[in-house]
């Protein structure tokens, strides 16, 4: 249970629990994380990308009728993952994967908006 993302979950205490926590979180970052997030959005009937409302940007809550795209998931959850890790190795790997994910979604949004 200590490896769950939830804010009120148990915090990992042992080295093994911290390693498991970090490994679980690293799976949602980088190229694999982008692919998983997009696949999940599509399987859930949500768009790959839609611009988030101002309300979502400020509160993390969608406006009525606003889809929860993979970009929403990135903004709400994935970009914060690297700050929750415990091990030095996990943080090092996360920094690289987070940078890729950030670049990927910036590029995806720019192409979606016709800016690139």
How should these model regions be labeled?
Residues 1-5:
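His-Asp-centered metal-binding catalytic motifs of divalent-metal-dependent phosphohydrolases/nucleases
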Residues 9-116:
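Divalent metal-dependent phosphate-bond-processing catalytic cores, especially two-metal-ion Mg2+/Mn2+ enzymes
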């Amino acid at each position: 249970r200590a490896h769950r993302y939830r804010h009120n979950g148990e915090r990992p205490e042992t080295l093994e629990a911290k390693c498991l926590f970090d490994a679980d979180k690293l799976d949602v970052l980088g190229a694999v994380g982008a692919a998983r997030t997009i696949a999940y959005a599509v399987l859930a009937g949500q768009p790959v990308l839609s611009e988030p409302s101002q309300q979502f940007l400020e509160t993390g809550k969608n406006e009525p009728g606003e889809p929860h795209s993979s970009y929403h998931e990135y903004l709400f959850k994935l970009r914060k993952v690297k700050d929750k890790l415990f091990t030095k190795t996990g943080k090092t790997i996360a920094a690289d994967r987070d940078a890729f994910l950030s670049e990927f979604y910036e590029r995806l949004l720019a192409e979606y908006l016709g800016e690139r």
